[in-house]
Design a protein with these regions (language model features):
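Short, acidic loop-to-helix structural element flanking the phosphoryl-transfer center
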Residues: 5-35
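Asp-based, Mg2+/Mn2+-dependent phosphohydrolase catalytic module
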Residues: 26, 35, 40-142
Length: 142
């Protein structure tokens, strides 16, 4: 158990911002309600957000450990949707870098998907949007 605790602490200490992340968050925060939907250990995820001072941008943070289900399970998304005031699937976009959890979860939940794919990888998944740089979000959302 001590090893796991140390591993989670070190994992939580490893946080960095993707290019343009802060700039985009500052813009999106003014116009949209933003939420974090993430798998993982709550302590680790909160620590990462705190290290980068990002919590202030998000209305709520949904973490699999606290919910009891992981993305891409529909139960994870059902829980999130029930806890978002005036939730509207038609006005929802999941943005993520994982095909298996973020994009598949969005498909399962029947919400629009935006895959952040900086490495120009290929996929056969039917996604709404694919971006290679966070600045590309401006084109999608305007």
């Amino acid at each position: 158990m001590a090893f796991e605790d140390e591993y989670q602490k070190n994992l939580g200490d490893g946080a960095y911002l993707i290019e343009y992340a802060l700039e985009i968050l500052n813009e999106l925060y003014k116009e949209y309600d933003l939420y974090v939907v993430t798998n993982g250990v709550a302590r680790t995820q909160y620590n990462r957000l705190d290290l980068l001072d990002l919590r202030k941008y998000f209305k709520k943070i949904f973490i699999s450990e606290e919910i009891g289900y992981q993305k891409p399970k529909i139960e994870f998304f059902d829980f999130c949707f029930k806890h978002i005031k005036n939730f509207d699937k038609g006005k929802t976009l999941i943005i993520g870098d994982s095909l298996s959890s973020d994009m598949q979860g969005g498909i399962n939940a029947k919400i629009d998907t935006c895959w952040y794919n900086p490495d120009y990888l290929k996929t056969d998944m039917n996604l709404n949007y694919i971006i290679h740089n966070l600045k590309d979000l401006e084109k999608i959302l305007k």
